[in-house]
């Protein structure tokens, strides 16, 4: 009959399962430290402010260094004009030259 089965220790379980062999207060007893509540979770991070949406700039740019475009513009001033102006190459000339 269910619930009356005796386990190795002589105890009984309502489900008919064998009880552990350890007597009360032995190794199988619950650790009193486990009854303490779990540690609290860390507080949530602070809400985002407008400073969080600031665009990220390089540290050198914040110290007053020029940007890449400004640096290129300075060098373009010293180049001859034919180098800075785009050279127009007809597209069909290269395509027609390859056709047998």
From Swiss-Prot:
Biased composition regions of type Pro residues, renumbered to the chain: 35-48
Domain of life: Viruses
Disordered: annotated segments: 1-86
Protein name as catalogued: Uncharacterized protein DR4
Organism annotation: Human herpesvirus 6A (strain Uganda-1102)
């Amino acid at each position: 009959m269910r619930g009356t089965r005796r386990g190795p220790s002589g105890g009984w379980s309502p489900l008919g399962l064998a009880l552990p062999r350890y007597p009360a207060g032995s190794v199988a007893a619950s650790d009193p430290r486990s009854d303490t509540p779990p540690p609290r979770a860390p507080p949530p991070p602070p809400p985002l402010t407008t400073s969080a949406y600031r665009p990220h700039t390089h540290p050198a740019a914040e110290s007053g260094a020029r940007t890449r475009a400004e640096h290129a513009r300075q060098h373009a001033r010293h180049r001859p004009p034919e180098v800075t102006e785009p050279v127009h190459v007809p597209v069909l000339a290269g395509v027609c030259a390859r056709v047998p």
